Amino acid sequence: HLEFADNWRYLKAHPLEVTGDILLLAGDIGYLGDDNYSKHPFWDWASENYKEVHCCMGNHEFYKYYDVATLPDGYLLEVRPNVFSHYNGIARIGDTDIILSTLWSRIPLEDAYFTEQVISDFRRILYKGELMTHAQFNAEHERCLTFIKDAVAYSQAAHKIVVTHHVPSFRMLHPKFQGSKANVAFTVELEDYITDSGIDYWIYGHSHTNIDARIGNTQCLSNQLGYVFSNEHQDFSHGKYLTI
């Protein structure tokens, strides 16, 4: 969330610990089409300190009225020569496929009116020139999920990592959100798929809470800074890493 000055001030004062060659970011870095995104000094720092940086796009990437319908599968934005933001993309590094997707979630019809009223996505994101609706939100989820499943199924890599913005199981729902009708805009239940997927790691964001869980043989991980001005950064790890 580099669109907020408090977050950048915090990261400048407490930079990431470089504990690996590749930096993976699960979305909500800033607004696409905004100079503050493309010219942000964080990208220069990340480019200099990591061999490669790969991000999936979060919902906030589209908050300057970006038209999601214009994004094809495999869309790749080169932020710096070794820094990339993906919409339904695959990065092959050595014997590992990194599959990156926003994912979105699935909003049941009975929750659609409430969700459209309380979630900013439906006031800030376009789809085919109009404000996105819950039906289009759900359609993007189906597109993303199909992409992920196909990418995993056809992968010949020894290891597979999935990076999504939205949360892939209610196993990672923080107790403070239990019972909220808005949960359907943040999380989708994919436990049955994940259990037998053969995915090594699934990295997620969006929830501003960090809960790791093992589903089958897949380790689900998160390390979100959240909003510093809301004091959501207390359990953020500056050097969290995984080894393949």
Language model regions located:
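A short helix->loop->beta-strand "cap" motif at the edges of active sites that frequently abuts
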Residues: N49-E52, A157, I199-D200, N217-T218
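Short amphipathic alpha-helices and their capping/turn segments at secondary-structure boundaries
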Residues: L11-P15, W43-S47, N82-D95, I99, ...
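Active-site neighborhood of phospho(di)ester-bond hydrolases with catalytic His/Asp-centered motifs
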Residues: L23-D28, H54-N59, F84-N88, I161-T164, ...
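Active-site-proximal loop/helix segment associated with metal-binding centers of metalloenzymes
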Residues: I99-I161, H166-F177
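N-terminal active-site segment of His-dependent metallophosphoesterases
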Residues: H1-C55, E61-T70, Y127
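Binuclear metal-dependent phosphoesterase catalytic core
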Residues: A91-G94, H174, K181-D200, H208-I244
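A basic- and aromatic-enriched beta-loop-alpha substructure that forms the phosphate/nucleotide-
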Residues: E52-Y127
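Active-site environment of divalent metal-dependent phosphoester hydrolases
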Residues: H1-N7, Y31-D35, H60-D67, I90-R92, ...
